[in-house]
């Protein structure tokens, strides 16, 4: 095949040069690209539309260019398809080339010009703005071609002037057009300085009388902005392509596997996986033979199955190595064999036999199969942590860097390693800033909102029914039994060996209790965990899940996103990439690590608006709010002085049914001030803050006033002596049946309440609606004479309390449905994970024991942190004063003492703080409503009691006086702090062993006995001694488990015991 030096395009064989129509396929021509450029001619770039008009109208554009001189014929070369580039004839040296070319040019000029004119392809028509045919690319005055030398100085000079707004200039460049003129030949050497343009033809951008350069600059700007994300583009077609991201439309579909894409380039890249594959074989490979139950030997593969290739490539087949059967007949779960590197044209695709992912190279397949085998070949040299990918190891090594730069947020103090993450984080603080509020995309079905349209589309797919369920057969074929699910052969997580020792048997029995209590539909989607192929009704096939694109190759669970599948695979591989820098504990998810940080910071940013209780997690606050949202019936609401539950007439009458649909059917709370209705008590309490200016709710018994109805409710319960006093005599329309007394709480609740509301209030009041409990709680709480103070006992677990308010608060624990019970102590839990965590408390041994005090820990990181208490090790030291700390968090807090910096500023009152936690705590003060205002100074308070205490400063009243000197104080805390000065100084008792100081001689004697090997803490039941209170508390739990019924006791056989 010969290339056309004139650049006409055709080169034979269906392939062309760069200047042709199709372009050279460089994957099929592995010759030197620079050598190819020296002997090819390129057509000048043509400008169309607005750009051509703007360039042609430049004031420095002269008339038509001069005619080029005749061109000498260059030598012809062969370009074999699969060989390196070699010239057809040897190129002479520079000394001989000039003489030979000059002597032969006169003899062959006529013939070469005629032949080249016959072989040259006619030039395409130019736009009217140019008005002349394009000139040749190179100048004939340039020297003859030099082998393998390419100079870019002329190219840089040409495009450098275009960027500066001036004309295209250079050797042989026609002014105003930007195309060089001359015969073909290489560019000048770097030592040769190309001559510049004439002074008359120079363009001055400052003398832009007609606005040509402004017009050209306008055309180069991005004038097509996106109305959703404000991103701009130069061309309208790019904007149209970008809008597919927001609309979620995927118009480009693969004809082999049916996957859709929003960009044509993504579809082109995807089609490489289906190279040389017929459409019938483009789908996922067929699942392998049926898997036997876990623990049983796998059947030997047939000859046909073993010979079938696992890839769909037309090249050398990449057959995975089948697991060889062992001596006892069981198949060894060996790793999946990796095909050898393909030589020649076999560049894939290679399919994974477990998850059906397709890869182009066998090395990529081998790297992917590490996920299934659980192998981690890359380990850290500092902490010995291992990873399955080299990129993960590089990312982890950066965490050990001492001088790692962290950029703190000026608002909340959170630090980031990347400036881009910090900018995104600060944009979240800005909210509705300069860019306006963020767009919200709500769901029309459930009302849930999302910040991105793609998330809304994925959410709507969950509402849509599966296609298989929508198109059910009408001929009764659906009732036919479904075949058991099949899975591809490969390494799976097999169960451990049968237990041999007593401890292993006990652990296996505990696991059987946990998984035996889990409902079958929960584990039906994981047939491999059940030890068999699974049932068709419970779990279905793991090979394909309706509506799920990405399926797990180990358990068959389907997911809608690839990222979710990757996070799920960590459950099988055991990878925990997120580590706490304080205690070393690891987590699979990053949000688990964020929740864990609250343990070290002890920050409780979530506060209940009604009772003021604070929590560290939003889930805890949500569960706590259910206490305030409990809907009270008419009987208890009238006793507590609360707004009664409004419902249909006769809802609390004798005709009310005991099987109501639920607590929210026809029930609502009404505001007594404005009459607005709310679904539960929590919302009406929040609404009451609008009407509150003082404390309008007073107690009839003691006259104490409250600003919240909920606080009045809890206060009135304190005045009740027994639970039966909460239930007043039944009204005329509510007579107890069977002639029982009106104070029988169980009868009143059975007939006057409906459904779950009555059951919940009955549990709160300590009674039960059934016949098994009767009035046991009432008798145990208030009835019966006892020698000590009156205590209130729980009828469910037998725990007793000194105050009735404590019993009411405790009753909420039993309102949560707990279906999983511990076989050792009988304690019940709502989830299997909570039960697994509880099982740890019954283990006799822990893996890591302290050699000094004998304390055991679950993890090595906890033991290492504990041993610092014995060695007085302080690994984190201050560089200013040299003080050591046990935690790095303590050192960061201590550094503020030396710097005095207060980097965290409140945006409301401009008050500054040294710690981010202090600023977060201060901001919550601005968020809380403060309706109580001082008339003297204008200071506001949340409660009226705080306002009255503050007004003493203006009145000069000192209500608190010291008993010793009679000095008066405004606040109680001030007088308590003052009275410490009158107390005699106590001698300091310091331990000679650990230098710990004590003020109480009793504690000091017990501490010395612990150093001497004594056990001063004795159990009152069995007399066993312990060195510390921690061991004694753990020992008492064992006695409590024995008293509750032992291992065979269930959740309903708990014996009563005082708290």
From Swiss-Prot:
Residues 8-21 have a biased composition (Gly residues). There is a cross-link at residues 802, 1040 (Glycyl lysine isopeptide (Lys-Gly) (interchain with G-Cter in SUMO2)). Residues 1-24, 58-142, 161-206, 275-342, 461-503, 726-747 are annotated as: Disordered. Residues 93-119, 297-316, 324-337, 463-480 have a biased composition (Low complexity). Belongs to the krueppel C2H2-type zinc-finger protein family. The gene is ZNF865. One of its GO terms (molecular function) is DNA-binding transcription factor activity. This is Zinc finger protein 865. Its main location: nucleus. GO terms for biological process: regulation of transcription by RNA polymerase II.
């Amino acid at each position: 095949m010969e290339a056309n030096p004139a650049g006409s395009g055709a080169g034979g064989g269906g392939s062309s040069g760069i200047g042709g129509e199709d372009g050279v396929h460089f994957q099929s021509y592995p010759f030197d690209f620079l050598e190819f450029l020296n002997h090819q001619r390129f057509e000048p770039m043509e400008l169309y539309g607005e750009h051509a008009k703007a360039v042609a109208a430049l004031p420095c554009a002269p008339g038509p260019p001069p005619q080029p001189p005749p061109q000498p014929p260059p030598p012809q070369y062969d370009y074999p398809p699969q060989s390196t580039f070699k010239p057809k004839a040897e190129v002479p040296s520079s000394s001989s080339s000039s003489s030979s070319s000059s002597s032969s040019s006169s003899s062959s000029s006529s013939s070469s010009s005629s032949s080249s004119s016959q072989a040259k392809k006619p030039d395409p028509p130019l736009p009217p703005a140019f008005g002349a045919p394009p000139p040749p690319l190179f100048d004939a005055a340039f020297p003859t071609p030099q082998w393998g030398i390419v100079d870019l100085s002329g190219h840089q000079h040409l495009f450098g002037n275009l960027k500066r707004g001036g004309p295209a200039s250079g050797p042989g460049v026609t002014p105003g057009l930007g195309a060089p003129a001359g015969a073909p030949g290489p560019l000048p050497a770097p030592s040769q300085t190309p001559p510049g343009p004439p002074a008359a033809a120079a363009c001055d951008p400052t003398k832009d009388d007609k606005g040509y350069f402004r017009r050209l600059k306008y055309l180069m700007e991005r004038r097509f902005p996106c109305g959703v994300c404000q991103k701009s583009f130069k061309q309208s077609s790019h904007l149209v392509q970008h809008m597919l991201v927001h609309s979620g439309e995927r118009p480009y579909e693969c004809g082999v596997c049916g996957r859709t894409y929003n960009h044509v380039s993504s579809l082109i890249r995807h089609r490489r996986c289906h190279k040389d594959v017929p459409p019938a074989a483009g789908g996922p490979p067929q699942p392998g033979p049926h898997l036997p139950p876990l623990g049983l030997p796998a059947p030997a593969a047939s000859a046909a199955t073993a010979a079938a290739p696992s890839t769909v490539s037309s090249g050398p087949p990449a057959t995975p190595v089948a697991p060889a059967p062992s001596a006892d007949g069981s198949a060894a779960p060996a790793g999946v064999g990796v095909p050898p590197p393909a030589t020649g044209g076999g560049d894939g695709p290679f399919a994974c036999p477990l998850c059906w992912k397709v890869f182009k190279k066998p090395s990529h397949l081998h790297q992917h199969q590490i996920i299934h085998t659980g192998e981690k070949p890359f380990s850290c040299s500092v902490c010995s942590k291992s990873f399955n990918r080299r990129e993960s190891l590089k990312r982890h090594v950066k965490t050990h860097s001492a001088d790692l730069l962290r950029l703190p947020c000026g608002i909340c103090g959170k630090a980031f390693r990347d400036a881009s993450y910090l900018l995104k984080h600060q944009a979240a603080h800005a909210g509705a800033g300069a860019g306006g509020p963020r767009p919200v995309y709500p769901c029309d079905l459930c009302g849930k909102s999302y910040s991105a349209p793609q998330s809304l589309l994925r959410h709507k797919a969950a509402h849509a029914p599966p296609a298989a369920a929508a198109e059910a057969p009408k001929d009764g074929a659906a009732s036919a039994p479904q075949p058991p699910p099949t899975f591809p052969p490969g390494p799976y997580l097999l169960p451990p060996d049968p237990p041999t020792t007593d401890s292993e048997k006990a652990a296996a029995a505990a696991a059987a209790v946990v998984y035996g209590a889990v409902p079958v539909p929960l584990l039906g989607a994981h047939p491999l965990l059940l030890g068999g192929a699974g049932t068709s009704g419970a779990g279905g096939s793991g090979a394909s899940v309706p509506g799920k694109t990405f399926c797990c190759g180990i358990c068959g669970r389907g997911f809608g996103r690839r990222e979710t599948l990757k996070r799920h695979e960590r459950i099988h591989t055991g990878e925990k990439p997120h580590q706490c820098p304080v205690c070393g504990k690891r987590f699979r998810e990053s949000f688990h690590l964020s929740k864990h940080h609250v343990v070290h910071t002890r920050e409780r940013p979530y506060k209940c608006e009604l009772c003021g209780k604070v929590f560290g997690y939003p889930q805890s606050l949500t569960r706590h709010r259910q206490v305030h949202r409990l809907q009270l019936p008419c009987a208890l609401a009238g006793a507590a002085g609360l707004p009664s539950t409004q419902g249909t007439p006769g809802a609390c009458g004798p005709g009310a049914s005991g099987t109501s649909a639920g607590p929210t059917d026809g029930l609502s709370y009404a505001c007594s001030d404005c009459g607005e209705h709310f679904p539960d008590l929590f919302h009406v309490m929040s609404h009451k803050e609008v009407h509150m200016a003082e404390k309008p709710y007073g107690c009839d018994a003691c006259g104490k006033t409250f600003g919240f109805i909920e606080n009045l409710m809890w206060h009135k319960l304190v005045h009740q002596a027994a639970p039966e006093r909460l239930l007043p005599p039944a009204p005329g329309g509510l007579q107890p049946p069977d002639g029982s007394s009106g104070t029988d709480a169980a009868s009143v609740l059975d007939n006057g309440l409906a459904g779950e509301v009555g059951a919940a209030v009955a549990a709160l009041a300590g009674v039960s609606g059934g016949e098994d409990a009767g009035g046991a709680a009432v008798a145990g709480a208030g009835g019966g004479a006892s020698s000590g103070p009156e205590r209130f006992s729980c009828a469910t677990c037998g725990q007793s309390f000194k105050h009735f308010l404590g019993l009411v608060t405790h009753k909420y624990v039993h309102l949560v449905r707990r279906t999983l019970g511990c076989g050792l102590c009988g304690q019940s839990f709502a989830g299997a994970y909570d039960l697994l965590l509880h099982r740890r408390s019954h283990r006799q041994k822990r893996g890591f024991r302290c050699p000094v005090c004998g304390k055991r820990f679950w993890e090595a990181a906890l033991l290492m942190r504990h041993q610092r208490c014995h060695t007085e090790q302080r690994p984190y030291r201050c560089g200013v004063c040299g003080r050591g700390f046990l935690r790095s968090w303590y050192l960061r807090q201590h550094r503020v003492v030396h710097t005095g910096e207060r980097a965290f500023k409140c945006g409301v009152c401009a008050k500054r703080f040294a710690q981010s936690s202090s600023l977060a705590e201060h901001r919550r003060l601005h968020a809380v409503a403060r309706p109580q205002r001082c008339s003297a100074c204008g200071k506001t308070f949340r409660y009226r009691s705080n306002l009255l205490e503050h007004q003493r400063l203006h009145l000069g009243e000192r209500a608190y006086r010291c008993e010793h000197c009679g000095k008066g104080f405004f606040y109680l805390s001030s007088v308590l702090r003052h009275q410490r000065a009158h107390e005699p100084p106590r001698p300091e008792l310091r331990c000679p062993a650990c230098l710990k100081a004590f003020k109480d001689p009793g504690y000091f004697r017990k501490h010395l006995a612990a150093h001497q090997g004594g056990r001063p803490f004795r159990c009152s039941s069995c007399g066993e001694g312990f060195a510390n209170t921690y061991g004694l508390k753990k020992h008492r739990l064992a006695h409590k488990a024995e008293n509750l019924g032992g291992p065979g006791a269930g959740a309903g056989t708990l014996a009563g015991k005082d708290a």
